[in-house]
């Protein structure tokens, strides 16, 4: 009578201790594990049974080869997961392998989970993060308010770093209820940079002289404008530069003064012509008197 044959049992076939039946097979040293038990210190989990048997885990004792080590998760695996459970880190981004009866199958990583949020919720999250960052960077601030031309300017100067200033411009708050402009500039800029409003017609009507330095002076004037007035794309900004032109030396010159100069030059030429006519008439009268004296 022989015992039941199986991969985990030894056959009592009547051979002696050194016979074939007593030879240890490859399952020798296998450690029994029960599904659902806490993981051992070596890191084996029930997924190792997938490798040794080629089948999924079943209730009851499972034989695990001690030569195989797995680093799995400690929490219980949900039923929707693969036999190996969640992929181990740091290979999550590359995917994970699953042992099937037909062999090892490589599974790509799952798509990232996206949560749809409303715009107001995202805006609130952004504002909170920005406020936390500002508290860390700026620290305490001193706030001063002033009013110019029906526009309220609220300036927040950093106490720790005086080079940082925050300018808040409030416009049309009473009419529209909104329209707040908040910016941060260096301390030397006491208000938002204004848009340069330059009348092209005034520039085109600039009186041109015959000298060669006219073009250079006009270029200097444009460079002065570009250096003194900063441009801004914000439509709510108000021009503080105005429409003016310079002669390159820094003195302002309006269109009326330019036209006055042309009128003065015309008047000077008229005076010159009148003086020359008077001199000619005097010379003619003298020549006539001399001719009369000679005739006598």
From Swiss-Prot:
Region described as Disordered: 1-45, 200-296
Name of the featured protein: Uncharacterized protein ORF21
Source organism phylogeny: Viruses, Duplodnaviria, Heunggongvirae, Peploviricota, Herviviricetes
Biased composition (Acidic residues): 201-220, 250-296
Segments of skewed composition (Polar residues): 236-249
Top-level taxonomic group: Viruses
């Amino acid at each position: 009578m022989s015992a039941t044959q199986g991969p985990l049992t030894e056959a009592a076939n009547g051979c002696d201790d050194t016979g074939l039946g007593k030879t240890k097979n490859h399952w020798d040293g296998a450690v029994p594990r029960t599904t659902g038990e806490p993981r051992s210190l070596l890191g084996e989990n029930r997924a190792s049974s997938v490798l040794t048997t080629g089948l999924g885990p079943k209730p009851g004792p499972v034989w695990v080869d001690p030569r195989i080590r797995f680093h799995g998760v400690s929490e219980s695996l949900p039923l929707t997961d693969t036999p190996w459970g969640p992929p181990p880190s740091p290979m999550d981004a590359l995917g994970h392998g699953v042992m099937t009866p037909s062999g090892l199958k490589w599974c790509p990583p799952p798509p990232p989970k996206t949560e749809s949020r409303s715009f107001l919720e995202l805006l609130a999250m952004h504002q909170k993060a920005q406020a936390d960052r500002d508290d860390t960077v700026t620290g305490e601030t001193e706030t001063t308010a002033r009013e110019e031309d029906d526009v309220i300017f609220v300036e927040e100067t950093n106490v720790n770093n005086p080079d940082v200033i925050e300018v808040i411009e409030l416009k049309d708050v009473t009419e529209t209820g909104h329209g707040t402009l908040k910016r941060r500039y260096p301390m030397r800029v006491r208000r938002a940079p204004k848009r340069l409003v330059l009348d092209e017609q005034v520039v085109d009507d600039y009186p041109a002289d015959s000298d060669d330095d006219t073009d250079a002076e006009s270029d200097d004037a444009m460079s002065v404008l570009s250096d003194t007035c900063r441009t801004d794309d914000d439509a709510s900004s108000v021009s503080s530069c105005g429409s003016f032109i310079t002669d390159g030396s820094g003195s302002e010159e309006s269109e009326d003064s330019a036209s006055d100069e042309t009128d003065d030059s015309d008047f000077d030429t008229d005076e010159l012509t009148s003086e020359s006519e008077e001199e000619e008439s005097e010379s003619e009268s003298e020549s006539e008197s001399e001719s009369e004296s000679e005739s006598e």
